[in-house]
């Protein structure tokens, strides 16, 4: 015979019960992905809500703790917009799209590497020293070329905006093998048609960078 007792739970008991339920629900997912590498794009509302920021960091730590190898690629649109406004950086729009001028690129670089990436690394590392923040500029991680943007059949110069053309995937894999979680800002050095650095840095969309890294892992 089974007895169902309706006993009020305090916050601690409820939390423990809910955690156990989540673990049971996640077991099939854990078995499926254990030992595999997963690329996760961090962006949207999760970047501006402190509660969602922490929940994301918790999820990444949980993935690592059950044997999944996460790679995080992050954007920073809301923070970049806020910093551009705060610093009164001149911004030009063409066909409704923001042009990444050298001045805008300086803000993008500062926000992605110095603010968003650092905050996420700190949240993850509050549990254990797992996360390592980096950008596409570090050790030739990513290489990019300027994007060709076509609107209504016309090519538009969007400034320092690029697409990934090469990924140093061996660097990423070596970090994963050491038990690290790469947290990657997608600002990337530009290369010419021969693969030589031009000395310029390009702003790369985080979704595009995450896709390029995932494809390089295949």
Residue ranges and their predicted role:
Residues 1-218:
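Nucleotide/pyrophosphate-binding catalytic subdomain
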């Amino acid at each position: 015979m089974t007895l169902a007792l309706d006993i009020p739970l305090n916050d601690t008991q409820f939390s423990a019960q809910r955690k156990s339920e989540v673990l049971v629900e996640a077991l099939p997912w854990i078995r499926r992905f254990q030992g595999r590498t997963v690329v996760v794009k961090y962006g949207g509302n999760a970047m501006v809500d402190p509660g969602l920021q922490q929940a994301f960091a918790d999820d990444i730590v949980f993935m690592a703790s059950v044997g999944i190898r996460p790679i995080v690629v992050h954007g920073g649109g809301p923070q970049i917009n806020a910093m551009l406004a705060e610093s009164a950086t001149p911004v030009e729009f063409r066909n409704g799209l923001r042009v990444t001028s050298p001045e805008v690129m300086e803000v993008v670089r500062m926000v992605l590497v110095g603010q968003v990436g650092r905050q996420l690394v700190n949240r993850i590392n509050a549990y254990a020293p797992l996360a390592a923040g980096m950008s596409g500029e570090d050790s030739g991680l990513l290489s990019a070329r300027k994007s060709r943007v076509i609107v209504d059949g016309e090519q538009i110069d969007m400034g320092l905006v690029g697409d990934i053309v090469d990924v140093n995937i061996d660097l990423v894999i070596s970090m994963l093998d050491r038990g690290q979680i790469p947290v990657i800002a997608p600002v990337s050095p530009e290369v010419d048609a021969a693969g030589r650095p031009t000395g310029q840095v390009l702003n790369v969309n985080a979704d595009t960078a995450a896709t390029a890294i995932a494809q390089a892992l295949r």
